[in-house]
């Protein structure tokens, strides 16, 4: 290693030079500049003859420059991070020193012991000194950036050239140590393609994107906040990047970024598959929801589950008076309790460990708290589990819903919002059928109240949607775990497709539907574009960077469909004022008949076997046709 390399390594290993070190360097540059200018104008021999007196003169002249350094704090910055502001401070300090020296010389004509220096030489030496001080700072910064700060940094392109992209670029340029080095921008705007921005070229977003990134030795794409939605909905671009093993990092989406504050590189995170699935931005009428929920008493069942806990979070933001949170899973409910204490300590909240099927306990809660709104998210949801345990599906899903619905009517709840599923449409499994029976019960009860057959004021609203990303036991966490173990990734069928929605987005629509509903509606959500599960698995494998992972087809599970629906063939829908929510026009049921049939079904669970229970369910829901299940014999 050369002496220069050793010195530079030693210097940059320090946090910064001490104040006195920076001042000493600047003073040396001023003295050098003055000596050089004087020598060039008066000759070497003449300078050597008076060198002693000249040095004394220059040291005296240095005093006002030192005062200027103190006034403008030129020494307080870290040289390797010098900016235009630091150069400006140096300029002001040198100008101050020059003016003081010229004024001093004019007023005193220098003492007999000092050498007279012409004003022209004073000005030239000051300009040279200022230039050298600037050059020293720029050189140190450039050398540090090009050699030390970016030694282990990855070359990255930024997708997006507007405010978000520029803010992100500034942030990564100020990282220390550098995580990324800016290699270029990607733009969808034709007018600025191949121009330069912040010293790098802007490239078009076309089929040559991967090739361009390879030429620039980059395998990282940073997505600006304003382009998050664009990349999600450009699946062709995403596929090209994933196949080329380009790492994609995202910042907060535009709705999470205020558009004014600078983005921080710490906000960048490598994408998950959930980030890249196509979906539309969902906005709801927050003011309408706020008017309904603020200052009200809210009861939420299944409050510790994936959907329930997100409903808790979203409802809490509207400052209700009281929240009663029910779940039979103690540990996750404790987590919800801690979340409420930490995030919303001013809301009166009660976490209740209980089974919703225990009518006596539920009645105690309704009598004590008398909720204005009930969000009913409690349910068993795993299809294979419910195929094996139909009596529990009936007990928890059907009878539990009936208990909560009846008590809501008895204690004057204004609105009851039930979370249903697309598996309730043309059900092929026990779980889906149990949820369809729940829909039938709350709809018929709502109509009975409207017809005056049941006394009460409660409005019953049902929300029906499909798979949510990241929920407990869903396919994405399963695939992640299988990839982590090295495979194989198991898919039930090569043609199976599903709709996906983020949990927060689904819960937003639940709140919106709950506030817009007048009772008796089944709201169905627009779930966006369907996703082939095998394509999802392939993407996740590529995104992980792990090679050689097999995808194994295991066959459809008991009761599993190839595709899900939100309406059956006899149902139609009509639009609402929200583009993502429609109202299903479904067959009406008589409340007394539905209640009688459900009574018989619940009682049968205590004395009859699985086949008899499922047979009764099929009598209530004639469109329930079992698939890949032992119950198919009942359809013959």
Regions found by a protein language model. Give the residues of each.
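Signature of alpha-helical transmembrane segments in polytopic membrane proteins
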Residues: 1-152, 180, 193-196, 219, ...
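Flexible, Lys/Arg-rich cytosolic regulatory linkers and terminal tails that connect or flank
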Residues: 4, 234-297, 409
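A solvent-exposed beta-alpha-beta segment
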Residues: 40, 44-46, 140-258, 331-335, ...
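NAD(P)-cofactor binding segment of oxidoreductase domains
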Residues: 232-249, 322-329, 368, 388-415
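Strand-loop microenvironment adjacent to phosphate/nucleotide-handling motifs in alpha/beta enzyme folds
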Residues: 245, 288-292, 444-636
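Conserved Rossmann-fold NAD(P)-dependent oxidoreductase catalytic core, especially the SDR/UDP-sugar
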Residues: 258-260, 376, 382-383, 387-440, ...
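N-terminal Rossmann NAD(P)H-binding glycine-rich loop of SDR-like oxidoreductase domains
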Residues: 298-316
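Conserved Rossmann-fold cofactor-binding substructure of NAD(P)-dependent oxidoreductases
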Residues: 353-373
């Amino acid at each position: 290693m050369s002496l220069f390399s050793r010195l530079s390594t030693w210097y940059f290993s320090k946090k910064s030079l001490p104040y006195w070190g920076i001042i000493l360097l600047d003073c040396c540059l001023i003295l050098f500049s003055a000596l050089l200018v004087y020598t060039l104008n008066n000759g070497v021999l003449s300078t050597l003859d008076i060198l002693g007196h000249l040095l004394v003169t220059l040291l005296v002249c240095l005093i006002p420059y030192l005062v200027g350094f103190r006034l403008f704090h030129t020494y307080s910055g870290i040289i390797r991070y010098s900016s235009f502001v630091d150069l400006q401070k140096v300029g002001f300090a040198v100008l101050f020193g020059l003016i003081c020296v010229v004024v001093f010389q004019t007023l005193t004509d220098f003492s007999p012991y000092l050498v007279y220096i012409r004003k022209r030489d004073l000005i030239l030496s000051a300009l040279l000194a200022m230039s050298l001080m600037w050059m020293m700072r720029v050189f140190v910064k450039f050398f540090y950036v090009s050699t030390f700060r970016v030694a282990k940094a990855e070359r990255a392109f930024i997708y997006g050239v507007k405010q978000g992209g520029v803010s992100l670029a500034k942030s990564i340029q100020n990282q220390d140590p550098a995580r990324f080095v800016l290699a270029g921008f990607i733009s969808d705007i034709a007018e600025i393609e191949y121009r330069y921005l912040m010293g790098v070229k802007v490239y078009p977003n076309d089929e040559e994107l991967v090739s361009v990134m390879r030429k620039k030795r980059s395998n990282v794409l940073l997505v600006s906040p304003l382009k998050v939605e664009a990349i999600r909905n450009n699946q062709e671009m995403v596929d090209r990047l994933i196949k080329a093993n380009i790492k994609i990092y995202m910042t907060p989406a535009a709705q999470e970024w205020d558009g004014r504050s600078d983005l921080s590189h710490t906000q960048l995170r490598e994408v998950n598959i959930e980030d890249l699935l196509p979906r539309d931005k969902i906005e709801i009428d927050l003011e309408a929801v706020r008017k309904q929920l603020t200052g009200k008493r809210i009861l939420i069942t299944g409050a510790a589950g994936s959907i329930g806990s997100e409903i808790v979070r979203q409802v809490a933001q509207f400052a209700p008076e009281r929240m009663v949170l029910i779940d039979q899973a103690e540990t996750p409910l404790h987590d919800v309790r801690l979340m409420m204490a930490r995030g919303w300590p001013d809301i009166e909240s009660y976490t209740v460990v209980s089974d919703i099927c225990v009518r006596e306990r539920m009645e105690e809660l309704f009598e004590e708290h008398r909720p204005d709104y009930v969000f009913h998210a409690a349910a068993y949801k795993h299809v294979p589990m419910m195929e094996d345990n139909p009596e529990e599906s009936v007990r928890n899903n059907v009878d539990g819903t009936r208990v909560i619905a009846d008590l809501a009517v008895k204690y004057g709840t204004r609105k009851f919002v039930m979370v249903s599923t697309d598996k309730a449409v043309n059900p092929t499994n026990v779980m889906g059928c149990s949820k369809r029976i729940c829909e039938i019960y709350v709809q018929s009860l709502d109509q009975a109240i409207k017809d005056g057959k049941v006394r009460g004021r409660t409005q019953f609203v049902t929300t029906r949607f499909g798979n949510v990303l990241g929920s407990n036991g869903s396919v994405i966490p399963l695939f992640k775990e299988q990839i982590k173990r090295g495979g194989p990734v198991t898919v039930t069928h090569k043609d199976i497709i599903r709709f996906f929605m983020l949990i927060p987005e689904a819960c937003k629509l639940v709140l919106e539907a709950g506030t817009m509903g007048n009772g008796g509606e089944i709201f169905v959500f627009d779930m966006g574009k369907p996703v082939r599960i095998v394509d999802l698995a392939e993407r996740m494998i590529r995104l992980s960077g792990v090679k050689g992972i097999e995808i194994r087809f295991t066959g459809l599970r008991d009761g599993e469909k190839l595709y899900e629906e939100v309406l059956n063939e006899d149902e139609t829908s009509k639009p609402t004022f929200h583009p993502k929510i429609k109202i299903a026009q479904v067959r009406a049921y008589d409340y007394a008949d539905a209640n009688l049939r459900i009574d018989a079904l619940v009682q049968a669970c205590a004395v009859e076997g699985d086949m008899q229970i499922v047979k009764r369910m099929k009598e209530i829901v004639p469109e329930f046709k079992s698939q890949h299940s032992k119950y198919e014999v009942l359809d013959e």
